[in-house]
Structure formats: structure tokens, C-alpha cells
Amino acid sequence: RAWLDSFYPTLMENGRTAGKTWGIPFQRSTIVMYYNKDAFREAGLDPDKPPATWYELVEAGKKLTASDGSKWGMMIPSTGYPYWMFGALTMQNDQVLMSGSGDQTYFDASGAVDALQFWKDLGSKHKVMPEGTIEWGTLRQNFLEGKTAIMWHSTGNLTTVKNNAKFDFGVAMLPSNKRRGTPTGGGNF
């Protein structure tokens, strides 16, 4: 019992159902915001104050985006684990996607619809992110090559970014809209 109690309770939640433990956390991670501090300085932004809200994210993104499309303010991947990114956006919009019992979904709730619209608008309306598909597998390289100043990605990338970034970078919590939030990823044994 002491061994099970040594895990973070929040990470144990998705391995439990009906009061029983069916799985234990393995290779867990969360989505974080990696940002290029040098790019922030060049854009006149404080490199020690990453965007804390959706509004600040859009405003910083506008300053960080090159008009010729050679550099984007931000990128959120839409392949690989798009449900994970969508889950982060809905959490930030104070919207759960499923009932606690797991028998009802809320994809059509206004908080979910608005979160999806915000994600789409980052490219189509605000022009701070490319429209269309953003590949999970190549996003990290885009960040390391300076093609985006901000990327949302897994904590699992920290070592690679740390070992390969040729610029000063920071890692921050994802911004909030109605609240802060990021779902855990990874798997269970």
C-alpha cells in the first residue's frame, strides 16, 4: 500500500475506476510552453514573462510572427496527439470533456466549442500560427531552427531542447483563459 501511496494522486486517477486501481503511472508527462527568450527580446517582450493568458499569447504571437511567414509566433501541433492539445485548451476554458462516470461527453458544450474556435483562430484570424496541419514530429525541430518562437509540447522534450537549442529558452505553464490547466499524458502499467 505504501508503494501505491508514493505516486502523485492526480497521476493515479486515470488508472482507477469504481474505486479500484487498475493501472499505475508510467512515462507520464504534461504539455508545457517552450519559448525562445532571444526571440522575445528581439520582439521587445520581457523574456522572463511568458504569456500567462490567451490574450497575452495572441498579443505576443503578433509581435513574434514575421510578416513573410519565415517565423511564426507560436505552434500547437495538430497531429500525433491533437486530443491532448484540445484537452489542454478545454481545461483552460474551464470545460471538462467527459462526465466523471465516463458515460457522457461534452464536445458540443460552449466551453469546448469556444476552445476549438480559439485554436483555429490562432492561424485563421490572428495569423500567429500556420493554418492547417502542424506536425507533432517536426515541431520540435521547427522550434530549434527558430521557425517558431513558442511551441506547446511534452515535458518529454526538455532534454532534447536543452541539449540542442542554440538560443536562450524558457519553459512555462500553458496560458489560461478562465483558469490554468494541462492534462497529463503518457501511459499506465
Model-derived features with residue positions:
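Hydrophobic residues within well-ordered alpha-helices
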Residues: L57, L64, G87, Q141-G146, ...
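A local structural motif
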Residues: G44-P50, G102-Q104, K120-T133, K147, ...
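Beta->alpha turn/N-cap motifs
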Residues: W136, H153-L158, P175, G187
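Ligand-binding "clamshell"
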Residues: A18, S70, Q92, V161-N177
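Short, solvent-exposed loop/beta-turn-alpha elements that line the ligand-binding surface or hinge
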Residues: R1-F7, P50, G73, Q95-L116, ...
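Extracytoplasmic "Venus flytrap"/periplasmic binding protein-like
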Residues: R1-T10, N14-R16, E42-G44, K49-A52, ...
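Hinge/lid segment of periplasmic solute-binding proteins
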Residues: R1-V32, V58, M85, G170-A172
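Glycine-centered hinge/linker elements that transmit conformational signals in sensory
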Residues: V58-K63, G102-G132, L174
